Amino acid sequence: MDRDILYIEMYKLFKRRRAWIGPVLVFLLIIISFPLTLDINSDNPPQIYLSFIWISTLLVTMLGTELIFSDDFEDGTLEQYAVNDQLIEVVFYKILVHWVLIGIPLAFVAFLFILSLNISIQISSIALLCLIISNLIFINFFSLGNALSLKKGSILGLLITIPFLIPVLIVLGKMTTSALLGLSLVGHLSLLVGVMILVASFIPFVISFILRTHLE
């Protein structure tokens, strides 16, 4: 793969600071505001907090990937990549860059928030790992949705991709319960990693095909 494309995509997203700082700030605002609405006498606050973080991460990741292809589609950059037979590379690198600048920072912000709740470092570290893995899954699926709805608006993409992400949220919820109960997480982690590898290996090719059909 051409690493120059990686550097270009990294520079383009880094230059649009609102595109990657904005989602992190929104996420930070959400997780700071949420405890103010929660009854401190709740029977199981750690599980509530963690479940809330999973869903918030999903929504903020959706926000952060909203324009992942649209700008390049409008200015003809995607068409140029297609002519040079580099579409799969640019899709892969766009997803990677969004994961590095948005997905991973979100995971670490959530990790610090979880630590502030007096949740054990072991559970917090597991949550961090799960967030890093799941954010890559989220970004791949939302990128797919954005590719599908490139000419039709983002609602269509959401309607298609959200159902695929519900099982991931279920697995994260099961992992939360198991971690708080001190049960083994090997099975859940293996499943999550397997899904991540499958999604990251397959979806970029699907996106590349969809983008090519838009350009024809």
What are these regions (language model features)?
Residues 1-23:
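Aromatic- and glycine-rich beta-strand/loop motifs that create alpha-glucan
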Residues 13, 62-80:
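Transmembrane helix boundary and interhelical loop/hinge segments in multi-pass membrane proteins
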Residues 49-66:
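Long, hydrophobic alpha-helical segments
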Residues 80-88:
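Short helix-to-coil transition segments within interhelical loops
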Residues 87-114:
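Selective transmembrane-helix segments that form parts of the transport pathway or gating/packing helices
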Residues 121, 130-162, 215-216:
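A structural motif at transmembrane helix-loop-helix junctions in multipass membrane proteins
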Residues 145-191, 195-197:
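Transmembrane helix segments
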Residues 200-216:
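Junction motif at the cytosolic side of a transmembrane helix
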